[in-house]
Amino acid sequence: MLEDLLGVGEIYVDYEGGNPTGTHKDRIARAHVEKALEEGFSGITVGTCGNYGASIAYHAAIHGLRAVVFVPAGYTNARLPEMRSLGAEVVEVPGSYEDAVEASRHFALLTGFYDANPGSNREVDFKAYSDMAVGIASRVRPTAVFVPLGNGTTLSGLWKGFRGLGITPTMVGVTTAFGNEILRRFYGESEGDFAETVFNEPLVSERSFDAEEALEAIKESRGYVFGFPDDVALRYTELLRSTAGINPLPASALVLAGLVKFVRKFGITDGRFVLVVTGGVHVG
């Protein structure tokens, strides 16, 4: 149905909303908790805007591991009650998401907790997301893959996974127009607008911790980056609901907007296009 509507070849939706806490973050949270247990840590910590913290809290609770989650006090933080209900200790930090990450890293150094923050044990993240690529490749050999961009970790891990299989699809990052380092650097801008909202929260990142890897993946794959405002995210959320039968987070639904813009910009309509919808609306 989407193919007919957009006039393109084949569209495949890789939907991560069925994970325990509703997003792809469960993949890396599970991997980090398992690594923390293997290495004898008594606790795990992370700085987060929400989804990753909920995932860490969930998987830590399953394994009896103490979780301390740092969040930026000024953000919407809609998943705080869920984290607390799962037994995590939540610490609100003045400032930005990046400040919460730094506070968590400092806490890990002081207490000896496992540091699950982006950039701290990135090979664990990349391995978990490269497994997503294996799953996608078992269904289709993609021409282009559209991925939400926050820190750039997911796109980087997917590219590593595809490349390991000898597959080289065009990697297209899709993010908010109002605050993402990868978007800004892709277009050669030194500064950009920043506005965190309840819809773009998973994507805003003044400092994208895996920006170098993501930009390299985009360059190697001859990919691209697109940024969109919230109204576009909401419009494509409704379109995915009505055509694909899923209930995506607006930040994840932007991948469809990315596909539409990609087709219009480059005139590429024939091919196998994969939309990585990283999260769905979750009732915790």
Feature annotation, model-predicted:
Residues 1-284:
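PLP-dependent amino-acid enzyme catalytic core
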